Amino acid sequence: MSAEILNPNLRRVVLASNNAGKLREFSALFAPLGIELVPQSELGVSEAAEPHATFVENALAKARHASRHTGLPALADDSGLCVVALGGAPGVHSARYAQQPGGARSDAANNALLVRELAAAGDRRAWYVALLALVRTENDPCPLIGEGLWHGEIVDAPAGEHGFGYDPHFYLPQQGCTAAQLAPEHKNRISHRAQALAQLLDKLRATGPVDRP
Protein backbone atom coordinates (compact mmCIF):
# COMPACT_ATOMS: atom_id res chain seq x y z
CA MET A 1 0.00 0.00 0.00
CA SER A 2 1.28 3.44 -0.82
CA ALA A 3 0.41 6.84 0.52
CA GLU A 4 0.85 8.20 -3.02
CA ILE A 5 -2.77 7.38 -3.77
CA LEU A 6 -4.07 9.70 -1.11
CA ASN A 7 -5.14 13.29 -1.48
CA PRO A 8 -3.06 15.62 0.72
CA ASN A 9 -6.28 16.59 2.48
CA LEU A 10 -6.46 13.06 3.83
CA ARG A 11 -3.10 13.23 5.59
CA ARG A 12 -4.82 14.18 8.85
CA VAL A 13 -8.01 12.34 9.65
CA VAL A 14 -10.09 12.37 12.80
CA LEU A 15 -10.86 8.93 14.21
CA ALA A 16 -14.46 8.88 15.36
CA SER A 17 -13.80 6.71 18.39
CA ASN A 18 -12.59 7.06 21.95
CA ASN A 19 -11.69 3.37 22.18
CA ALA A 20 -8.00 3.13 23.05
CA GLY A 21 -7.72 -0.35 21.56
CA LYS A 22 -9.13 0.75 18.23
CA LEU A 23 -6.84 3.79 18.20
CA ARG A 24 -3.78 1.56 18.67
CA GLU A 25 -4.83 -0.82 15.93
CA PHE A 26 -5.83 1.82 13.41
CA SER A 27 -2.78 3.99 14.06
CA ALA A 28 -0.58 0.98 13.31
CA LEU A 29 -2.54 0.22 10.13
CA PHE A 30 -2.55 3.80 8.84
CA ALA A 31 0.99 4.83 9.79
CA PRO A 32 2.58 3.21 6.69
CA LEU A 33 0.22 5.29 4.54
CA GLY A 34 1.42 8.58 5.95
CA ILE A 35 -1.95 9.28 7.56
CA GLU A 36 -2.11 10.82 11.01
CA LEU A 37 -5.14 9.67 12.95
CA VAL A 38 -6.32 12.10 15.59
CA PRO A 39 -8.79 10.72 18.15
CA GLN A 40 -11.93 12.80 18.36
CA SER A 41 -11.47 13.24 22.12
CA GLU A 42 -8.36 15.36 21.46
CA LEU A 43 -10.53 17.71 19.40
CA GLY A 44 -13.31 17.98 21.95
CA VAL A 45 -15.79 15.83 20.03
CA SER A 46 -18.24 13.76 22.03
CA GLU A 47 -19.23 10.26 21.04
CA ALA A 48 -22.04 10.05 18.51
CA ALA A 49 -25.20 8.08 19.15
CA GLU A 50 -25.34 4.60 17.64
CA PRO A 51 -29.09 4.07 17.22
CA HIS A 52 -29.05 2.01 14.05
CA ALA A 53 -29.57 -1.70 13.52
CA THR A 54 -26.67 -2.14 11.10
CA PHE A 55 -22.93 -1.66 11.35
CA VAL A 56 -22.72 0.46 8.20
CA GLU A 57 -25.37 2.96 9.32
CA ASN A 58 -23.69 3.41 12.69
CA ALA A 59 -20.26 3.86 11.11
CA LEU A 60 -21.57 6.55 8.76
CA ALA A 61 -23.38 8.36 11.57
CA LYS A 62 -20.19 8.47 13.64
CA ALA A 63 -18.01 9.62 10.74
CA ARG A 64 -20.35 12.45 9.75
CA HIS A 65 -20.67 13.55 13.38
CA ALA A 66 -16.88 13.80 13.78
CA SER A 67 -16.42 15.62 10.48
CA ARG A 68 -19.20 18.08 11.30
CA HIS A 69 -17.56 19.07 14.58
CA THR A 70 -13.96 19.25 13.33
CA GLY A 71 -14.08 20.20 9.66
CA LEU A 72 -11.69 17.31 8.98
CA PRO A 73 -12.10 14.12 7.01
CA ALA A 74 -13.28 11.44 9.40
CA LEU A 75 -12.88 7.72 9.72
CA ALA A 76 -15.33 5.68 11.75
CA ASP A 77 -15.44 2.03 12.56
CA ASP A 78 -18.43 0.08 13.72
CA SER A 79 -17.53 -3.45 14.56
CA GLY A 80 -18.70 -6.31 16.64
CA LEU A 81 -19.03 -10.00 17.22
CA CYS A 82 -21.78 -12.11 15.68
CA VAL A 83 -22.43 -15.57 17.12
CA VAL A 84 -24.35 -18.18 15.15
CA ALA A 85 -26.02 -19.79 18.17
CA LEU A 86 -27.22 -16.38 19.38
CA GLY A 87 -28.83 -15.41 16.10
CA GLY A 88 -26.08 -12.92 15.29
CA ALA A 89 -25.93 -11.33 18.75
CA PRO A 90 -24.31 -9.41 20.29
CA GLY A 91 -23.91 -7.73 16.88
CA VAL A 92 -24.14 -3.95 16.92
CA HIS A 93 -24.51 -4.12 20.71
CA SER A 94 -21.16 -5.87 21.19
CA ALA A 95 -19.47 -3.04 23.11
CA ARG A 96 -22.39 -2.68 25.51
CA TYR A 97 -23.62 -6.27 25.59
CA ALA A 98 -23.61 -6.56 29.39
CA GLN A 99 -23.89 -2.85 30.18
CA GLN A 100 -26.49 -1.95 32.77
CA PRO A 101 -28.46 1.33 32.50
CA GLY A 102 -26.19 4.10 33.71
CA GLY A 103 -23.29 1.70 34.12
CA ALA A 104 -19.89 1.57 32.49
CA ARG A 105 -18.95 -0.69 29.59
CA SER A 106 -16.70 -3.60 30.50
CA ASP A 107 -14.94 -6.15 28.30
CA ALA A 108 -14.82 -8.55 31.26
CA ALA A 109 -18.58 -8.30 31.83
CA ASN A 110 -19.31 -8.70 28.12
CA ASN A 111 -17.15 -11.81 27.91
CA ALA A 112 -18.67 -13.32 31.04
CA LEU A 113 -22.18 -12.84 29.66
CA LEU A 114 -21.19 -14.32 26.31
CA VAL A 115 -19.82 -17.46 27.96
CA ARG A 116 -22.98 -17.82 30.06
CA GLU A 117 -25.25 -17.40 27.05
CA LEU A 118 -23.34 -20.13 25.20
CA ALA A 119 -23.17 -22.57 28.11
CA ALA A 120 -25.59 -25.03 26.52
CA ALA A 121 -24.74 -24.27 22.89
CA GLY A 122 -23.05 -26.90 20.77
CA ASP A 123 -22.42 -24.53 17.87
CA ARG A 124 -19.64 -22.11 18.78
CA ARG A 125 -19.11 -20.56 15.37
CA ALA A 126 -18.77 -16.79 15.31
CA TRP A 127 -17.37 -14.01 13.22
CA TYR A 128 -16.06 -10.53 13.78
CA VAL A 129 -17.43 -7.78 11.54
CA ALA A 130 -15.73 -4.47 10.81
CA LEU A 131 -17.29 -1.65 8.80
CA LEU A 132 -15.12 1.36 8.02
CA ALA A 133 -16.61 4.58 6.72
CA LEU A 134 -14.42 7.42 5.47
CA VAL A 135 -16.02 10.78 4.72
CA ARG A 136 -14.07 13.68 3.28
CA THR A 137 -16.69 16.16 4.49
CA GLU A 138 -19.74 15.89 6.70
CA ASN A 139 -22.07 15.65 3.71
CA ASP A 140 -19.76 13.63 1.47
CA PRO A 141 -22.19 12.05 -1.05
CA CYS A 142 -19.77 9.23 -1.85
CA PRO A 143 -18.35 7.93 1.43
CA LEU A 144 -15.87 5.11 1.13
CA ILE A 145 -16.94 1.90 2.84
CA GLY A 146 -14.81 -1.12 3.67
CA GLU A 147 -16.07 -4.36 5.18
CA GLY A 148 -14.13 -7.17 6.79
CA LEU A 149 -15.23 -10.52 8.21
CA TRP A 150 -13.06 -12.72 10.44
CA HIS A 151 -14.35 -16.21 11.20
CA GLY A 152 -13.63 -18.22 14.31
CA GLU A 153 -15.34 -19.83 17.27
CA ILE A 154 -15.99 -18.98 20.90
CA VAL A 155 -14.12 -20.81 23.67
CA ASP A 156 -15.02 -20.72 27.35
CA ALA A 157 -11.53 -20.23 28.76
CA PRO A 158 -9.84 -16.93 27.86
CA ALA A 159 -6.31 -17.04 26.50
CA GLY A 160 -3.85 -14.35 25.46
CA GLU A 161 -2.71 -10.94 26.59
CA HIS A 162 -3.05 -8.93 23.38
CA GLY A 163 -6.04 -7.36 21.72
CA PHE A 164 -9.22 -6.24 23.44
CA GLY A 165 -12.94 -6.90 23.49
CA TYR A 166 -13.81 -10.54 22.87
CA ASP A 167 -10.33 -11.45 21.57
CA PRO A 168 -9.39 -13.77 24.49
CA HIS A 169 -12.43 -15.96 23.72
CA PHE A 170 -12.26 -15.75 19.91
CA TYR A 171 -10.45 -18.88 18.77
CA LEU A 172 -8.99 -19.10 15.28
CA PRO A 173 -8.71 -22.75 14.15
CA GLN A 174 -6.37 -21.93 11.27
CA GLN A 175 -4.02 -20.09 13.63
CA GLY A 176 -4.36 -22.55 16.51
CA CYS A 177 -4.84 -19.76 19.04
CA THR A 178 -7.16 -16.98 20.11
CA ALA A 179 -7.06 -13.50 18.62
CA ALA A 180 -5.57 -12.29 21.90
CA GLN A 181 -2.63 -14.68 21.49
CA LEU A 182 -1.63 -13.27 18.12
CA ALA A 183 1.24 -10.83 17.97
CA PRO A 184 -0.26 -7.39 17.24
CA GLU A 185 1.62 -7.04 13.96
CA HIS A 186 0.27 -10.41 12.78
CA LYS A 187 -3.27 -9.61 13.87
CA ASN A 188 -3.07 -6.32 11.99
CA ARG A 189 -2.45 -8.24 8.76
CA ILE A 190 -5.37 -10.67 9.00
CA SER A 191 -8.05 -9.17 11.24
CA HIS A 192 -11.49 -7.96 10.22
CA ARG A 193 -10.23 -4.37 10.50
CA ALA A 194 -7.24 -5.10 8.28
CA GLN A 195 -9.58 -6.63 5.69
CA ALA A 196 -11.94 -3.66 5.88
CA LEU A 197 -9.06 -1.22 5.48
CA ALA A 198 -7.72 -3.09 2.46
CA GLN A 199 -11.14 -2.93 0.82
CA LEU A 200 -11.53 0.76 1.64
CA LEU A 201 -8.13 1.58 0.15
CA ASP A 202 -8.91 -0.40 -2.99
CA LYS A 203 -11.98 1.80 -3.43
CA LEU A 204 -9.90 4.90 -2.81
CA ARG A 205 -7.53 3.84 -5.58
CA ALA A 206 -10.44 3.19 -7.93
CA THR A 207 -12.19 6.50 -7.33
CA GLY A 208 -9.09 8.66 -7.12
CA PRO A 209 -8.56 11.49 -4.67
CA VAL A 210 -11.37 13.96 -4.25
CA ASP A 211 -10.60 17.49 -3.11
CA ARG A 212 -12.48 19.01 -0.25
CA PRO A 213 -14.51 22.03 -1.40
UniProtKB/Swiss-Prot annotation:
It comes from the Bacteria. It is an enzyme of class 3 (hydrolase). Belongs to the HAM1 NTPase family. It catalyses: XTP + H2O = XMP + diphosphate + H(+); dITP + H2O = dIMP + diphosphate + H(+); ITP + H2O = IMP + diphosphate + H(+). The keyword Nucleotide-binding applies. GO terms for molecular function: dITP diphosphatase activity; ITP diphosphatase activity; metal ion binding; nucleotide binding; ribonucleoside triphosphate phosphatase activity; XTP diphosphatase activity. NCBIfam families: RdgB/HAM1 family non-canonical purine NTP pyrophosphatase. The keyword Hydrolase applies. Substrate binds at S17, N18, N19, A20, G21, K22, S79, F164, G165, Y166, D167, K187, H192, R193. Pyrophosphatase that catalyzes the hydrolysis of nucleoside triphosphates to their monophosphate derivatives, with a high preference for the non-canonical purine nucleotides XTP (xanthosine triphosphate), dITP (deoxyinosine triphosphate) and ITP. Seems to function as a house-cleaning enzyme that removes non-canonical purine nucleotides from the nucleotide pool, thus preventing their incorporation into DNA/RNA and avoiding chromosomal lesions. Mg(2+) binds at D78. It comes from Bordetella parapertussis (strain 12822 / ATCC BAA-587 / NCTC 13253). InterPro entries: dITP/XTP_pyrophosphatase, ITPase-like_fam, RdgB/HAM1. Its cofactor is Mg(2+). One of its GO terms (cellular component) is cytosol. GO terms for biological process: nucleotide metabolic process; purine nucleoside triphosphate catabolic process. Keywords: Hydrolase, Magnesium, Metal-binding, Nucleotide metabolism, Nucleotide-binding. Pfam families: Ham1p_like. The active site is at D78 (proton acceptor). Homodimer. Its EC number is 3.6.1.66. This is dITP/XTP pyrophosphatase. Binds 1 Mg(2+) ion per subunit.
